[in-house]
A protein has these predicted regions:
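Phosphate/oxyanion-binding active-site loops and adjacent basic polyanion-contact surfaces
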Residues: 19-23
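S-adenosylmethionine/decaboxylated-SAM
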Residues: 2-18, 28-213
């Protein structure tokens, strides 16, 4: 199986977010591989937004008969805030005036039939990681693009990935003209330079690595 199909694919593509179709399929394939190498271990997504990528990831986790923990504070990244390029006013909670993607995420999971597979974890990624005790088959980092945020996400979660497990990183751009450098320098290069991770695939801005030691 190389791609998400049927109604779930339609739901994913209808969901607000930044995951291109071909990269979603690559994420799906990577998660299936992680579940095969590390059977029974849960998976983690950092930065779920409205759940677009989570449909691909969660569908794979369901096939692997495991759980996906979707970690997000649901207040949006820096670039999603009012006045920034990627701000979406339809995601603002009128009662608070603040961005709140949680209701949209929960609706997406319900529509996709993934509420039994995807566990919604609302909070700061490093804080959640600090109390995490179990190895994971895969970690997909798609959080904020500020350098400290990206570095903290990697530092917090890379050690929880099991040997043979997968680290996937979104928005990896080697050329600064194409996008921010934090995911590339603070996560991808940090992983490669650690000697603990080796490249598996590159699809668009999605990089997939496996833990080798």
């Amino acid at each position: 199986m190389t791609e998400l199909s049927g109604e779930r694919r339609t739901i994913a593509l209808e969901t607000t977010g930044f995951m291109p179709e071909v990269e979603g399929d690559a994420l799906f394939v990577a998660a299936l591989a992680a579940g095969k190498v590390c059977p029974g271990l849960p998976m983690v997504e950092i930065g779920s937004y409205c759940g677009r990528s989570t449909v691909w990831f969660g569908a794979a986790a369901q096939i692997c008969n495991t759980l996906l923990f979707a970690v997000d504070h649901h207040g949006g990244s820096e670039e999603n805030q009012i006045g920034w390029e990627w701000h979406d006013p339809t995601l603002v909670d009128e009662s608070t005036g603040q961005l709140n993607t949680l209701p949209h995420f929960e609706k997406t999971m319900s529509r996709a039939g993934l509420t039994e597979t995807v566990r919604t974890v609302v909070g700061d990624s490093p804080t959640i990681a600090s109390t995490w005790t179990q190895e994971i088959a895969m970690c997909f980092i798609d959080g904020g693009h500020a350098r400290d945020v990206a570095a903290n996400d990697y530092a917090a979660w890379n050690g929880h990935i099991a040997l043979g497990g997968i680290l996937a990183i979104h928005d990896v751009f080697t050329d600064p003209a194409l996008g921010g450098q934090a995911p590339y320098e603070e996560i991808y290069l940090a992983a490669k330079n650690s000697g603990k991770f080796a490249d598996v695939s590159a699809t668009g801005s999605l990089r997939v690595l496996t833990r080798v030691k």
